[in-house]
């Protein structure tokens, strides 16, 4: 499948689907079809952007996630916390308060993805400087930070794959660092 992940975070509740086609017209990669009055996701086309979840008036689509209680099943329950997590709360809660709440929920360690941002930014800047020094430098260069954008390019615009910045995202750098521990 062109290196595209086979795991999909969007699923359907058939009993809620009314076949209204709103999700079909909203899907940026045309990954939804209606058969027998029910929507079906074409997994090989889905980029997991979540747009169908957002627009479905019947809440027939949902994001697959693990129950928070499953954290207890792991010896090492590590969370990679994106910067946006900390902005979701009232300013009276510090990062330390939020991290402590995550630990209280059962996570054994909290890693902040933002800690890898400076290193990735430097690597990206160095790559771009070197790249644009070349006479026939490929343009535009597209950020590789968003998994949905990467899947969109792989599925819908494969001719743009070579335009993706070949530097891993801060989230991927954080995940690799944690795996190496």
What are these regions (language model features)?
Residues 64-181:
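Iron-sulfur-associated redox domains of electron-transfer enzymes in respiratory
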Residues 2-14, 18-43, 47, 51-66:
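Iron-sulfur cluster-binding cysteine motifs and their immediate structural context
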């Amino acid at each position: 499948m062109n290196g595209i992940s086979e795991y999909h975070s969007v699923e359907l509740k058939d009993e809620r689907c009314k076949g209204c086609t709103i999700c079909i017209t909203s899907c940026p990669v045309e990954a939804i079809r209606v058969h027998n009055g029910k929507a079906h996701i074409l997994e090989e086309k889905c980029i997991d952007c979540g747009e169908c979840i957002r627009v479905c008036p019947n809440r027939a689509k949902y994001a697959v996630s693990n129950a928070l209680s499953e954290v207890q099943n792991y010896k090492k329950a590590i969370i990679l916390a994106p910067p946006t997590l900390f902005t979701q709360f009232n300013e009276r809660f510090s990062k330390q308060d939020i991290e402590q709440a995550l630990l209280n929920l059962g996570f054994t360690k909290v890693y902040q993805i933002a800690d890898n941002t400076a290193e990735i930014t430097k690597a990206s800047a160095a790559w771009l400087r070197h790249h644009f020094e070349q006479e026939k430098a490929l343009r535009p260069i597209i950020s590789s930070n968003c998994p949905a954008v990467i899947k969109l390019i792989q599925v819908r615009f494969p001719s743009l794959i070579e335009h993706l910045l070949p530097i891993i995202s801060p989230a991927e750098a954080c995940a690799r660092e944690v795996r190496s521990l």
